[in-house]
Amino acid sequence: MRESEIVLDFAIQVRRALELQGFQVVQTRQGNENPSFDDRSATANAQRGAVFVTLHISSTGLPGTARVYVNSDLLPVANSNGLIPWDRAQAPFLGLSRTFGDLVQGFLTQRFKGSPDAAQTASVRQLRTTAAPAIAVEISSVTVEDRAELDRMAPGVADAIGRGAAAFKPSYIVPNTPGALP
């Protein structure tokens, strides 16, 4: 089994679930091309009011479970010019990422017994350079003998991400009011 093919299949379903919730989706990877992490982050960071979700199929963990990771704490860096270093773009969003991650993890736990109750922290390369609430969703496990076991998880994972994003939106997106400055 190729992890990249399975992830793309999951991504299609996640996209549909998010669109059903009314979200516009921009994918940073659409096929077997392999954009760099920096290119993916640049695409994500160009969006306004966005959240970032990266999907992975792990080779570890209890098969049939799913985990959400948020970036570990990033120590603040004081730059005299006021700019945030690229590899610390996530720092201002850590609290929002935790909230988003916990919501998605709660929905995953309802679907996949044995999954953790809350998002976990890890140093995830792709999240560090993302200037938006960002989570990594990891599905276990690529080591299953029958790919159909993973394929059966895709709708539940997609639904959990869609529902989590919808639940998170009010805490992140402030609606515009007529006459107010954006």
Language-model features and meaning:
Residues M1-P182:
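Active-site-proximal helix/loop segments of hydrolytic enzymes
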